[in-house]
């Protein structure tokens, strides 16, 4: 069966969904889908899985605070029988996670790559081969894990996904669960637009351990952000990518909409975890090298984040800050 063959499911029948990499993003969307009647299995770390198995997933938003009964597992084999796999691992773990789940995927399953960066769908497709349907998804949501089995939502919650045999059905079913989904043939442009925003703020927030509002108020930071964005846009143009909307305006407006938010890279650095910097600013650097476009600021930010202390004092670390996936 090739990737164009959809798994036979009724347009109204509940979906079987596996979340590969059950962090804040996957848990939030998974909880909404489970509340809507879909069969959702979270695949994550032992402490988180144990909490969900014992108590369900605690979903905390501005409007509600509920326990959502869900299945959970630490094993990649739990993707078996899933109609849709929400692939939410860090970009640093893409190939490894894809290899782990490959033997267990059901024929006709759709893998949605819901990650930072612009090439995860290509990397997953290279591992899984042409027989598996893989569609990129752009995620717009602010969420954070407040502890094992506890996800907090701070704002937004939309997806833009690439076309596939199942994408329209997924959009309808997700929409009925309260998740706004747009199926777009220009997901690459949307992924790049989000990449530019991430390149502008993620590294700076991580290096300074500051949320976006105070960060951009510091003298000179706004100019640095503008220069980083200019480099990214130059690489995108050279790569033949058309970005939707006014990306520089979106970058400038972000701190006002979420002034208290730390970047996901800031949280990774604070906790001593591997960051995705090589798939954010580092990706722009690599494409710039290949296309002959200089990217000195993006390179500097990439190197500095790599050199950042592996762990900061607990008093300096952000306390469960919302993460802009």
Task: Walk through the language-model features, giving the residues of each.
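NAD(P)-dependent Rossmann-like dehydrogenase/reductase catalytic/cofactor-binding core
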Residues: 2, 175, 226-325
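Nucleotide donor/acceptor-binding cores
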Residues: 14-16, 83, 157
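Rossmann-like NAD(P)(H) cofactor-binding subdomain of soluble oxidoreductases
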Residues: 29, 64-150
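Short phosphate-binding/catalytic loops that engage adenosine nucleotides
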Residues: 38, 179, 241
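Rossmann-fold dinucleotide-binding core
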Residues: 114-194, 200
